[in-house]
Each structure stands twice: as structure tokens, then as C-alpha cells.
Amino acid sequence: MTPVKTQCSLAGQLYAVPLIQPDLRREEAIQQVADALQYLQNISGDIFSRISRRVELSRRQLQAISERVSLAQAKIEKIKGSKKAIKVFSSAKYPAPEHLQEYGSIFTGALDPGLQRRPRYRIQSKHRPLDERALQEKLKYFPVCVNTKSEPEDEAEEGLGGLPSNISSISSLLLFNTTENLYKKYVFLDPLAGAVTKTHTMLGTEEEKLFDAPLSISKREQLERQAPENYFYVPDLGQVPEIDVPSYLPDLPGVADDLMYSADLGPGIAPSAPGAIPELPAFHTEVAEPLQPELENEVLLAAPPPPPPPPPPPPPAPTALVSTPQPPMFPDMATAAGQVAREEDSSSSMAHTASVQGAPKEVVDPSSGRATLLESIRQAGGIGKAKLRSVKERKLEKKKQKEQEQVRATSQGGDLMSDLFNKLVMRRKGISGKGPSTGTSEGPGGAFSRMSDSIPPLPPPQQPAGDEDEEDWES
């Protein structure tokens, strides 16, 4: 047979060991005792195994924490003797998971062994007959549940109590000339003035007197009004002591030697004031335009540098070389071509290596040209040694130069080389002060124009030229 399971466990408790029922037969009692002991053994083994697993898990967590502590201690010991400044960055959030793991009971998932099916045993012995006398004797040794709860006492009535038996009429029950039942609620009233209900509680408080008035009323005293406290935050630096210490203290334990603080920390932060944003100075940037060579009809022309402000004139632009063969020149151009050829003799020795390709490799530095100009002015003696001429002579010379230029322009054709030569001559005249671009000037202006005549022109940039160009110039 199967033992009867008693429900004597608490709420949430998984295990429940059955008790041995009384008045059992011998074989039945032995079988239930064996089942109960086996059940208790299974429960004990399950409980202790779960406790051991939880202890092992806690031990592993503690070991991991100990390893982290030892690692942090080793890092601290390593940087303890260092004299270098160390920056420590703190995380914006606390290093913890967003959702904490809830505590789990060690009995989670446990099954009650009592729910398993057990083998059934058949007992051949018969039950003993019921003995009432023996049952009464057992009440002396076993506790018996008796209802010991006390019944609530009758509440005290507010009236006179129960109705007497000698009342024969309604007028004897009610108070004279009223509708009040004194046996139900006891009141004191004047039958002619009206009923005023008074209970036992009111009767008890009626005998008490009022308390004495406070001193502020009896002695006419007034309490001093306290001023409200100001809880506004007013920052103040207070008295800061001035400490005179050296700026650098070497060989101090635990103090970094590569960290310097500036004494000028700017305006203080207390008391708080609206910070004004300083105005930044305006910067004007000038973008220099790059020189872009222009190729027209296979002619390489170098752009002249921007003219500097007067009085120092800009240096002359480098002469351009033509890759095509030179056409035959007119007789009046022979002398000018010979002069240009003599200027190119210095660079003709290096012109046999390569032909003209691309932009010139060397460009005359404008600063060196200005330095050469100033040096030439110093050598000429300045304005003091200049020979002044009259204005009429200068005007006559300019008229003659204009007439000669007009004659040359009409006599010369549209030859490319002649046009280039004319532009070169006009530029040199404009630099020397003989051209029409100079305008009429009086006083020191004419002296400068005459001084510029004695200044030699800047040497042209060295450009490699082919054999054909050299032969053309020599011819």
C-alpha cells in the first residue's frame, strides 16, 4: 500500500517528509518507516549537493575578484615610484550592467521526490479491533487542538440597561414629555426647554476644565520675529594665504617632475560673473596667384612679376626664346639683334645640352633685383652727383623718341620676332624712364630717370637653346 502523505509544509517549501501514522499494523508501520527514511535521505543529498554547488560558484567569483585586486595592486606598485605625470580618465557611467542579476534560490528547479511513483506492497495481516479505552489514554500523551479563543465580551450599553418587567405602558418607558428612551441612551435634558443628548463620554469631559491660556495671551508678551535665512549660494574665495615656495622641488616621493602649472590661470571663477567672450583679431590673408605660362604659336612667354610700389622700379621680365627658326631680319634691326646676341653670349655655352621645353628652370628673384638697383644707386652717388638738365631738352628728346617709334612701327611688318623685340625695347624704355609711361616730372624725378640710365639691365635667365637658335643669333 502507499503511505498517506500529510500536508504539513510551509508555502514555497519543496520538500515534505511524511509522518508515520499511529495505530498501524506491524508490517505497515515498518514499511512506512523505511519509505520515510529513504525519502529523507534523498532530500538531504539533494539539499547538500545544491549547497556545495552554490559555495563553489561563490568561491570562483571570490577568486576572480582576488585576481583583479592583485592585478590592480601590481599596477599600483609599478607606477608608485614613477616621477611621470599620469592622467586617469573616469568613465561617464558606472561600470555595472544595466540590469542586475536577480538572486536565485538554490532550490530553483528542484523536484519533490515524494511525487514519484512508489512500489505497492500487499499486507496479509488483519487490523486490530478498535479500543476506546486505549484511545482515551493516548490523549494524555499527544497534544489535542482545543479552541481557546475567548468570546468577545458584551459591550457596555449607553442606556440604563435592559427593560424592567414592571413597565406597563409607553409613557413609563419614555422620558416625560419627550421621545427619548433612557434604557437605550441616557440623556440629561429639560423637558420644557428641549432635549440635549449627552452620552457618558460627554459627561466625563464635562467635569474637566479648560487649560490655562499661554503666556503670550495672559501676559501680553510678543515673540520676536525671526529674520528669514538666506539660502542663496554666494561663492567667495575668502582669505587665501600666500605661500612662498620654489617652483620646482626635486626628488620628492610620489610627486611628478614633468608636470608644470602656469601661474597665470586667468580670471577667477568666484564670485560667479557672466563670462565675456574675447574678440578675436581679424586676419587678412593674401592669396598669391601662381604664374601660369601661356603658349601661343609655340612661343613660351614668362609672366612678369607684379610691379612694386615706386620709387624702386620692378625688374625686367626674362626674355623669351622661340623654338621656330628665325626669319630674315630687316637692316634696321641688325644692330639691335647684335646687342641682344651679345647679352645671350654668357648663357650660350650651356644651351647645347637640351632644347627649350616648358617653363624656365630659374627665375630671377625680385629681392635680388631690388638689391642690385639700390647698390647701383649708391655707386652712382645719389641725387647730389646727378647732372640736372632743363625741362625743354627732355621734352625735345621725348618728341624725337616718339617719332622714331612711329617710323619703326610703320616700317616693320607683322613679324613675330620684330614684335617681340619692340615690346622688349618699350619695356626697357619704360623702366629707364624714357618711355611715355613715365609722364612729366619735375625736380628729383628727372634725376632718378637719368640715374637709371647708368644702371645696367638685369641678366636674363639662363635658358637652354638649340643649335639652330645659336646659329640664327650669330647670323
Curated annotation (Swiss-Prot):
Bias-annotated ranges (Polar residues): 347-356
Span list, region Disordered: 300-475
Gene Ontology CC annotation, any one: endosome
InterPro entries on file: WASH1, WASH1_WAHD, WH2_dom
PROSITE patterns: WH2
Broad class of the protein's primary localization: membrane
Domain WH2: 369-391
Self-association state and partner proteins as the record states: Component of the WASH core complex also described as WASH regulatory complex SHRC composed of WASHC1, WASHC2, WASHC3, WASHC4 and WASHC5. The WASH core complex associates with the F-actin-capping protein dimer (formed by CAPZA1, CAPZA2 or CAPZA3 and CAPZB) in a transient or substoichiometric manner which was initially described as WASH complex. Interacts (via WHD1 region) with WASHC2; the interaction is direct. Interacts with BECN1; WASHC1 and AMBRA1 can competitively interact with BECN1. Interacts with BLOC1S2; may associate with the BLOC-1 complex.
Domain characteristics, as noted in the entry: The VCA (verprolin, cofilin, acidic) domain promotes actin polymerization by the Arp2/3 complex in vitro.
The protein's name in its UniProt record: WASH complex subunit 1
